[in-house]
Amino acid sequence: QLLIRAEHVCTTDAKAYYYYKHKGSITTHNDDESKTKRFNDIRGVLDRLQYLCDRVPQSDRVALQRRVAQLTMDYIYQVIIQQRSQKALNACINELNSKGLFPLPDRDYSQKYIWFRKMTNSRLGRTILLNTLPLLKKER
C-alpha cells in the first residue's frame, strides 16, 4: 500500500527483506499442518488485498488489482505444486471463483501470466498444468 501511494521512489541496492532458512521455519516443513497454514496465510493476504481494492482511490486500484491477480496466480501455482491433486485444484478454483478472484483478469501483465490464465480457464489446461508443473519444478 505504501508503494502504491508513494509520490517518489528511490532505488537502492539495500535488501529490504532477506529470508534465512532455518529448521523452525514454516516454509521448510512439508507436513500437512504447515502446508495448511501456508495456504491459509496466502488466502488471508488475498482476502485483505481484495478488501482494500474496494476502498482505495481509483488511481491506486489498478496497481492493487494487478497485485491481487498475480498473487492469485501464485496461489493456484502453489496448490498445483504442493497438493498435486485434481480435487484440491478444483476446490481452490471454486473458492477463488466464489470470492471473485477467478477467472483471472484478462490482462497482459506478463507472458507467464497470459499463458497461465489461459491454461487455468479450461479443465484440460488445468489438467495439463497439474501433470507438468510438478515435473518442471524438480528439474530446476
Role assignments for model-derived ranges:
Residues 1:
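Acidic donor-binding loop at a coil-to-helix junction in glycosyltransferase catalytic cores
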Residues 4:
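Short, well-ordered alpha-helices that flank and scaffold nucleotide-derived cofactor binding pockets
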Residues 8-44:
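Nucleotide-sugar-dependent glycosyltransferase catalytic core
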Residues 62-67, 90:
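Short, charged, amphipathic alpha-helical segments
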